[in-house]
């Protein structure tokens, strides 16, 4: 195989690797070639024709040329320049240059920059206005009269995000971008990811927040912009002066528009991007090709749901309860109240009478300081975080089998896999950017997707095969599939012999897991399970993703263990495109646990009960540490009721809504002697507190987050804290010092340096190594070497071998005649959990204004109810009143309740956790949220739908195609390739 090819570029020879994109090679040599439709994150689209060069004497597009032979390339001769000029002129026939008064004139308009760099002074063809008006969606708008039909938005929607809404209608007299079958944006299947606006090279697609806000001359009254455009064009007869003036205005904008790299504060994907702000106004979010987890992909929350930052609901001063009511006070008074109460409770009842709940929304540094406050200052290990509510069972299963409690590879491995198996994860709504990577792999590269879920969500609809097991029975089919693979000699014996212990004992434990047993337990036909087992065993590479549908069961740890067992038996660890991926729910739930906000583990999952570990931290902290494991979230609530816990300090967690059996939890709050809540808002939980502290959200501080793939990333402060709110780390420091300690951190980087000294997993982590879009995936060696793929050097046990873990199953979920309906629950795309942050963005609330219950058509018919009906759901622990959305996403007596009940406005009305009980996973105390039964009482039989009629879920059909279908453009009678014109 030839290693290099000779490419002669403008008379100079270069050695180039075969398969290199010609345009990328030309750019790498600092040679300018226009390329308006090309984007490095999407590849060649071939619509603009501006990148033409001469290849071996013929004018061709460089963007779609792969270097597969020696070639001579000319970018400067007259024929090339003439072809490029023709292509540029055709663009200006569709796009009016009025740069100085354009909101997009921020230094990154690719039409402006290309025309300027090329040296275009006058256009040959007159601009032709199209017979279309602007189309406004809730978050972005489309201006057909500025659209050059490059197709980037189509490529992004169809083949990057794979939402499959946007197309170009090439057949009409005046082609334009359309949504679905040519409906307005707001009536389409658009999910408002915003990537079309991200990739648009000009002002055709633009965020609504940008319009009229970006420039010095764009904040005009409606109608006056047209006059300004006319005036500008008359005053700037050639493009040279226009570019000079607009460049000066763009330079001025740098003084008013601040661009700050940050990391998304919602789910665990860890999307990074620049946030553009003007004063406190958030203009746009712009992802980058350099964004390690998401590249240029976003979802509606990360791109647009930032209303919470400037919400009038933000807390700006501390609140102290006096005579039953909250009063605003200065920080000094609030800190004194906290210090006095912590001290008196500790003196009266001992340190273990105080408990602390950390936040998966906060930074690593802040999570570290909360556990340090609990352990060093108070002397208790009663500290936990919300991984107890969701991911602790997955971590347990991985600790049992492979030794690390995190994803075994990277997000890009999910794209590389030959087969993806999704179990109990609504990925397209809970982790939409990851779902896009998998949808793309399926659509373009043939990845096979298998989905096991009780609900027919989007990934189930798209799956190559969809299986609907009975609730809580995944362990049965997972173990039966594993047994079948071994029984039929399909297991990876070489991998097992070299890398896995305890095979014989494990295989013996599978004796009862026959396919017949699995069919009876799960309801999945034996033939389907056999076919899946054979495909799984024979696939070149397999990844398994799972989430709360697995972990929030009372056998969540065992089911997670069964997943890892299957991967070990088939040899699907230690290679690209393989492994276990328990998709983390929050932006920093992985990091919060990494930082030691756990009752039995200190940073990096080091046991607090180990003498040598405690000794290391005691030397750093200067105090003796409590050797006894503390209480977890579940045990804290029990401890309050039992009189063992008298004080609770929580931050960034609405425990009174998100814990299970919240009637029981709220009753516990009422029994506390003293309660502190620290948050952006006066949350439902905060209404029970004695002191409420105003905390700053992510855009108002520096720090790091660790995402689902163990990726540690920096976020930078974009805005000053609102009012008297403070970053959590500063609040913890103030409390520690008020209690007699001498914390003196000047910046979060110093906190991370301390973490690195104490934590082998983070040993090489530093802010310098995380500069900009750089990131590290733990474990990180002292020299900064990280591990995107775990276990390449062996598994995280003393002998380097993984362990197969025997399991059993007899845990059938049965409903009785009274509580005859199974209640499933989870996220919606638009909202995050209870919605405290997302409901602060008006257009998010417009899309999904309230919580509701999904009911199957057959259950609706049985109960005589219709869309919009109001029903009361009653369980053994409580009741909730909700409106009905009838959908075939659920079947039979399965119902689904989204988590977003807007608790700050509605209290606990309609909250799913009024119905859940206190049952937990026996190994982790994770609540069994998914094992809930209820009965249904009809209040009204029909009403207004709880969903906005423009919501994409309401009878909206996708319109998939491959890319922009540029051949349709080429087939038009009015199209001639510029190179052919030059040849003529």
Curated annotation (Swiss-Prot):
Ranges for domain 4Fe-4S ferredoxin-type: 138-165, 181-211
Reactions listed under catalytic activity: formate + NAD(+) = CO2 + NADH
Enzyme Commission (EC) number: 1.17.1.9
A UniProt-annotated Pfam family: Molybdopterin
Cofactor binding remark: Binds 1 [2Fe-2S] cluster. Binds 4 [4Fe-4S] clusters.
Domain 2Fe-2S ferredoxin-type: 3-79
Record's keyword terms, sorted: 2Fe-2S, 4Fe-4S, Iron, Iron-sulfur, Metal-binding, Molybdenum, NAD, Oxidoreductase, Repeat
CDD domains on file: fer2 (cd00207), MopB_CT_Formate-Dh-Na-like (cd02792), MopB_Formate-Dh-H (cd02753)
A molecular-function term among this protein's GO annotations: 2 iron, 2 sulfur cluster binding
Residues annotated to bind [4Fe-4S] cluster 2: 147, 150, 153, 200
Record domain 4Fe-4S His(Cys)3-ligated-type: where: 79-119
Binding site for [4Fe-4S] cluster 1: 95, 99, 102, 109
4Fe-4S Mo/W bis-MGD-type domain span: 257-313
Keyword Plastid: no
UniProt: [4Fe-4S] cluster 3 binding residues: 157, 190, 193, 196
Binding residues annotated for [4Fe-4S] cluster 4, in chain numbering: 264, 267, 271, 299
Recorded superkingdom: Bacteria
Cellular component aspect of the GO annotation: membrane
Region (Formate dehydrogenase) residue spans: 252-984
Keyword DNA-binding assigned: no
Entries under InterPro entries matching the protein: 2Fe-2S_ferredoxin-like_sf (IPR036010), 2Fe-2S_ferredoxin-type (IPR001041), 4Fe4S_Fe-S-bd (IPR017896), 4Fe4S_Fe_S_CS (IPR017900), Asp_de-COase-like_dom_sf (IPR009010), Formate_Dh-H_N (IPR041924), Formate_DH_asu (IPR006478), MoPterin_dinucl-bd_dom (IPR006657)
Similarity section: In the C-terminal section; belongs to the prokaryotic molybdopterin-containing oxidoreductase family.
Name the record gives this protein: Putative formate dehydrogenase SAV2309
Native species: Staphylococcus aureus (strain Mu50 / ATCC 700699)
